[in-house]
A protein has these predicted regions:
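Flexible mid-to-C-terminal extensions adjoining Fe-S/redox cofactors in radical SAM and related proteins
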Residues: 4-12, 16, 20-23, 27, ...
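Short loop/turn microsegments at loop-to-beta-strand junctions
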Residues: 120, 346-348
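Conserved alpha-helical substructure of the radical SAM core
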Residues: 36-204, 476
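Radical SAM/AdoMet-radical enzyme domain recognition
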Residues: 148-168, 174-289
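Radical SAM enzyme [4Fe-4S]-AdoMet core and its adjacent flexible, acidic
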Residues: 1-57, 61, 229-345, 353-355, ...
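Secreted/processed peptides and extracellular or luminal domains of membrane proteins
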Residues: 134, 138-141, 348, 367, ...
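Short cysteine clusters
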Residues: 128, 132-135, 342, 356, ...
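Short, charged low-complexity linear segments at domain edges
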Residues: 96-117, 329-332, 336, 370-387
Length: 476
């Protein structure tokens, strides 16, 4: 009875929100200020005390200021996005993932006493049509694939726990584009985001993505044609440009996925490049610190401490109101303060590779569990995942969040204690070999990281997913 009532309430809430979004989008053409106020009011109605009253009022103030960077950014996205895509994203990402999913996840973390993620990343295939320098995935070949049934199992079981955001990587996920579209159509209440090299995005595919409305893209790009093609191969930059033009034409949401290395940091962060991305239609992006994963990795590509400090300062500037570029960058390694440190091991996300192995992180190729013979919940209770759950945060300085890159002794200890095995599909790498490559880097980075953190005002989170975390005062 309770389940039936919950399902009815869910359907009614989604339908009601859908009507509100329709009205807001209809106003967007001629009254953006009214649209912004409506969206904040809707957020307050659904999220309530998840944010303070001051936060909601400040949001209204900023979003109704025509000169605000955030107003300009949202206007760019609204102008560019197909209405059906915008509506579906608002419902799937805004309502299902952020509102309803978050509530379910927090309840299930208490119920099951383990990490429950906010998103799941999985690889439909190990196949890739490129061979980027320093990329482990390009070495895997095409021998492993998750079946449609495997992917359906991941999403179905994830939804039962409250997970409504799924990211796909590989390999190249669009090698399996037919199954990806089939999956998105079956699970039309979740949001899918695909990391892609762009080469397989074509017009017929974009037509289907627009029809479905629940797929976004992160396109791999690394600066100029020269810096990009030097690592990713001749002709790749042109393929990305073509894909951007198609996605913009069809009003499909897309951003960028950028791996920054010792060799390309200026090329992927300078004003000219950022403005160019906006002109092409990308207004958000993920930056990833190069990781020396795999026996064939190139540790010399890891940034210097000075370069990493520059990235911290640069990304924060690009996000600030002092910068007029309508682009929102996120840095997977340097934004730990906003997510409480390491998010892997299911704390906020985990990864399933194309052989079905469940890994704590896309960069941590060790596991005790496989989706072929275990459920998502069993995976989250597996020894290595529970070691993450019991050990997070791995460092109180969230500029040193990772148990591999900045605290390599911790990953080595967890792998040994849990008996996790290497999941590298081509050339299994011992945890000693991996962590040895990180020790000098960790030692070099620590003084700079600690100096930055010592002058940083740490804000207490209203909610934190650590094993024994409790707020210093009751939440509203």
């Amino acid at each position: 009875m309770n389940t039936s009532l919950e399902n009815l309430t869910h359907k009614m809430q989604r339908a009601a929100l859908g009507k509100i979004v329709d009205v807001a989008l209809s106003h967007a053409e001629h009254d953006r200020e009214k649209t912004m106020c409506q969206l904040v009011d809707v957020a307050k109605q659904f999220y309530g005390s998840g944010f303070s009253d001051e936060t909601y009022e400040n949001a209204k103030k900023v979003l109704t200021d025509p000169d605000s960077k955030w107003t300009k950014l949202i206007n760019c996205v609204l102008d560019q996005t197909n209405p059906h895509v915008a509506r579906t994203t608002a419902l799937n990402l805004g309502y299902e993932a952020f509102f309803r999913g978050t509530k379910m996840i927090r309840e299930n973390r208490v119920k099951y006493q383990c990490n429950i993620p906010w998103l799941i990343l999985f690889d439909p295939t190990s196949a890739c049509n490129m061979h980027s320098v320093g990329c482990w995935a390009g070495e895997y070949g095409n021998k492993n694939n998750l079946s449609f049934e495997d992917m359906d199992k991941i999403v179905t079981q994830g939804k039962e726990l409250g997970v409504y955001l799924y990211m796909l990587t590989g390999g190249e996920p669009l090698v399996r584009k037919k199954d990806v579209l089939k999956l998105a159509e079956k699970h039309n209440d979740v949001e899918f985001a695909i990391y892609t090299n762009s080469t397989l995005i074509d017009e017929p595919f974009c037509e289907e993505v627009q029809r479905l409305g629940n797929i976004a893209f992160m396109l791999s790009i690394e600066g100029t044609p020269e810096t990009n093609d030097a690592r990713r191969g001749e002709g790749h930059y042109a393929a990305v440009m073509h894909a951007m033009d198609l996605l913009k034409k069809y009003g499909i949401l897309f951003g960028t996925s950028i791996c920054y290395t010792r060799q390309n940091i200026d090329a992927v962060t300078n004003d000219e490049f950022m403005r160019f991305l906006c002109e092409k239609g990308a207004h958000f992006g993920f930056y990833f610190h190069y990781m020396p994963v795999g026996n064939e990795a190139a540790p010399e590509l890891m940034p210097t401490p000075e370069q990493r400090k520059y990235m911290i300062d640069r990304i924060r500037y690009l996000r600030s109101s002092a910068c007029d570029i309508p682009f929102y960058p996120m840095d997977f390694q340097n934004d730990g303060e906003f997510v409480g440190g390491c998010i892997a091991g299911g704390r906020n996300y985990f990864h399933i590779n194309s052989a079905g192995d469940a890994e704590p992180c896309v960069f941590i190729h060790y596991s005790n569990a496989n989706i072929h013979d275990q459920s998502i919940l069993e995976i989250l209770h597996s020894p290595l995942f529970m070691a993450y759950h019991n050990g997070q945060p791995f460092n109180k300085n969230h500029l040193r969040p990772c148990p591999m890159l900045e605290n390599p002794e911790l990953l080595e200890k967890m792998v040994h204690e849990t008996g996790a095995h290497s999941t590298d599909l081509q050339s299994p790498e011992s945890v000693e070999h991996l962590c040895e490559k990180c020790k000098a880097y960790a030692a070099d980075w620590q003084p700079t990281a600690d100096e930055i953190w010592s002058h940083h005002k740490v804000r207490e989170s209203r909610y934190e997913n650590y094993k024994d975390w409790k707020p210093s005062q009751p939440l509203d």
